[in-house]
Amino acid sequence: PEHHFLSHRAAVEGYQPEPGKWVWDRDAGQRKVLLECRRMGVDFFEAFANSPPWWMTKSGSVTGDKDGRGNLRDDMIGPFADYLATVAAHYRDKAGLTFQALTPLNEPLGDWWKFGNKQEGCVIPPGQQAKLITATRKALDARGLTTGVTGPEDNRTSQTLNSLAAYDAAAWRA
């Protein structure tokens, strides 16, 4: 909130700037492109998150942890999954757009996600990834969404394989 180091193109506002407060008119440019794509006939949409909202992070920033380690607070795995599912349900209910896939994990092992970065991003270690994927599936189901849960979307194949090896059966089913 008081951090001003994100570049203009990367300063994407989240829909929940603080716990309990939703602001649905944020990120107008990307919303416009999304809905225009649908109008033009695109029929597959995947939602993704670069980072949890700042208040769900250990560092208080969407750019990463001060040491480049995991930045999602353990007590926020469920709330972050609920956040993602609420956004997906909002698009279904208010815009008539259903996401076919959702990934809560964009480059979750990137060693460049450090506090003060010019772009949002979040390290999420493999064990925590599995919990988040499972929680996201449950949150989507609770809202009647059939959206698939995907991830991790790592920068290197070796990172993806490392993450997948740590997933439990529940994460694989999600």
How would you label these PLM feature ranges?
Residues 1-100, 104, 120, 124, ...:
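N-terminal catalytic cores of secreted or lumenal carbohydrate-active enzymes
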